[in-house]
Amino acid sequence: MTFEKYFDHIIEYPILFAIRDNYIEPNGQSFKDFILGNFTNLKDKANLKDFETHLATIFTEVRLKQYIEVRSLDACDWQCLCDGPAFFTGLFYNALDEAYEIVMKWKKENVMNAYLEAPKKGLETELEGKKLYEWGAIFLELATKGLSNRNQINSKGNDETVYLKHVQNVVKNKKNRAQLLLEQY
């Protein structure tokens, strides 16, 4: 998706509310209506704060704010709190081109099918001829390499790859948290 398509999606998305002195209901209007001054319950046009509020009400996997917010890891347990940010840091700062070369070949419908299948099949879900744990290993290797290249050393002499231990275990065991919980019962 290009930035232009993302922006079009965002402004066409129905606005949930606006805030002035109190909450103002939009009656199903889009943010584009608000930008154009066609917001029936408010005479003002939208401002930057309104746009930031609107963005906070859209729950896509990735959101563009003043930073890129990756939301897919917003419900993990204690062990993975550092893994997600470390994983994406390794990819975004040092291996983004390599990761892009992989995913650019994927078909959108196959990704969406895997997205819908994963809650049922876990890491056994197939995507483009590989199981998700296999893709996990590939991207984990890229993230690990990226973090190693950053060479950010802590007071104990370790680089940021120490924060990937939980993800390494998930990929190695080929089971996510839900699968492990199901095995207990």
Residue positions per predicted region:
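C-terminal accessory/tail domains of diverse enzymes
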Residues: 1-185
